Amino acid sequence: VPMEAPSLLDLPTDRIQESDLADVLWRDPSGIDILLAPPRVEMAEMVTVRDLEKTLSLLRRVYEVVIVDTPAVVNDINLAFLDASDTILEVVTYDSTTIHSTMVMADAFRMIGYAPTKVRYLVNRVDSTGGFDPEVLVRALGRVPEHSVSSGGQLVVRTNNEGIPFVLADASAQDVRDRHARVG
C-alpha cells in the first residue's frame, strides 16, 4: 500500500456520496477496492461511530460484498461493524492464547445476542497444529469450525513481503489451487 494512499479520513462524512468513494479507495493488484484505516493510530480518534455507519451503509449499496477487518478488541467502533454485519468470520489458530480469546469473544457474542449462525470460524494454518489437539478447539467453540486454510509456507511469506496477493503470484502452487477449489 503506498504511503500516500487515501484513507477513511479523506471522506467528507458529513455529506458522503457514491462519487466520493472513487477518491478514497485504493485498488490492490488483484482489483479489490480497499478503504484504508487512518494512517496513524492517533488519527483513529477522529472517526466516529456515526461516520462509520454512514460509510458502511454507502459501501453496502455500491458493493455486493463488504469485508471489514477489525482488530480483536470490542469497542464502540468495532461493535458498530459487528452489529451491522451479516456474517462475522473469526480467524483462529491452534494456540492456547488464540483459543482463550476466541472463547471470550464467543461468550461476548452470546451476551450481545448474536445468533450462532452469524458467527463463523476459519482455522488459519490448519496444517500447523504445533502439537495442539484440534479437538480442543472444537470443544472450545462448541462446534466444528466452518472453514480452514493451510499455512501456505514460503509462498505466502515471500509474496506478503513483496506486497503481492499470493493467489496471483503462482497459480500452480498447491495452496492457491486449494483456495480456488474452496471458492469455486
Segments (PLM) and residue ranges:
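Phosphate-binding loop that captures ATP/GTP phosphates
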Residues: V1-I34, E45
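Phosphate-binding/switch loop-helix module in NTP-utilizing enzymes
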Residues: A37-N78
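Inter-motif core of Ras-like GTPase G domains
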Residues: L58-R61, V74-S96
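G-domain G4 guanine-recognition motif of GTPases
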Residues: V92-T93, V119-G131, S148-Q154
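Conserved C-terminal guanine-recognition region of P-loop GTPase G domains, centered on the G4
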Residues: T102-K118
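Beta-strand-loop-alpha "switch" segments that mediate conformational coupling across diverse proteins
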Residues: R125, V138-V167
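NTP-binding/hydrolysis catalytic cores, primarily Walker-type P-loop NTPases
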Residues: N161-G184
